[in-house]
Amino acid sequence: MWLEGYSSLSYVNDWRDAFAGSPRLSADLCNINDLLDMPRFMRRIRDYDLVVVLHSAAGDSMRQVRRATAALDSRRGPLVVFFGNEYAGMTEKIGFARDVGAEFIASQLPIESARWLYAACNPARVLASPAALNPTVYKTAEGPRTIDIGFRGVLYAHPFALGDEERTDLLRFFVEGARSWDLVTDISFERYAAAEWAAFLNRCRGVVGAESGTYYLERDDATRRAVIEYVGQHPNATFDEVFELFFARYSNPVSGKAISSRHFEPVGTKTCQILLEGDYNGILQADRDYISLSKDYSNIDDVVRRFRDDGYRSALVDHALDHVLAEHTYTHRVNRVLDEVL
């Protein structure tokens, strides 16, 4: 089950295509936004040995997939739910998983954080299912790389509610410092569809980024809702003000910082990544698969020096691609899920 309309969020289509193309499955795709398609598939729900709800159907809104609750209750095979945006709307998402008795929840989060987040969904098993690479779309192309540091992307909705501005501050830092480092930058806040994004990456020698998500996972969205309400009432509030009020004394936070598809796509195009130090689900290794920048930027001179070294940069992107192609494509991810659930 998926939802059409996410052409600029390529990972949701990459997961769909990987399941649909798996030689281990004979898969039917149900677009839950199709008023004819959806009821037809729900009437046949008992015909299926496995039911998968993908991120697009259980991400921004649960309204459409909720219409399938009664049908899902009558399924014969196990249900795997992939939730998108695991930093928002978690009350509804956890409630859905419990109401339909999902046997498996596939999470993009580091596994211990995911188990904490979905503890109320017991006995559902939580599967580590982070993003991956689609090597048929994200691959190298002929042509010059005229941009040193590039970026295309959009800001999170309600960014203050995440509790940090790491990526925004990082981009601002590179825009302001580019001239002194003699780097050509092309940084703007817009989202490209997959083919256009891949073409842009192939014009870039490098991109900058940070882990996705929040340091403050919550099962009930209490802090997120409070921040959104506060900012709505105080539209001129600064991030520092919001952080001091809602996050500075936050007790025992559980981090939901994670690797995302945006960290795999440059690997496919051999575009060097300069990333803020982080764990990246233990998949990408600092200074082997990307150049690691300290969170206080204290090693920026060394980072720029290494980035400008063509030989170093070439060896790094080659290593990253070999590593990811060996273990971290969407084909690998789907096979691992199927190994667990069938």
Label each PLM-derived region with a short phrase.
Residues 1-32, 80-81, 98, 196-342:
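Catalytic binding pocket for nucleotide-activated donors in carbohydrate/polymer assembly enzymes
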Residues 1-122, 134-138:
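Extended catalytic core of nucleotide-activated donor transferases of GT-like folds
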Residues 5-12, 158-168:
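Glycine- and acidic-residue-enriched helix-capping/strand-helix junction motifs
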Residues 124-131:
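Aromatic-residue-lined binding/catalytic grooves and analogous aromatic/hydrophobic interfacial grooves
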Residues 132-145, 195-196:
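Acidic anion/phosphate-binding donor-loop and adjacent secondary structure
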Residues 143-162:
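Conserved donor-binding/catalytic core segment of Leloir-type glycosyltransferases
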Residues 168-186:
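A conserved nucleotide-sugar
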Residues 184-190, 210:
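Active-site donor-binding acidic/aromatic loop of nucleotide-activated sugar
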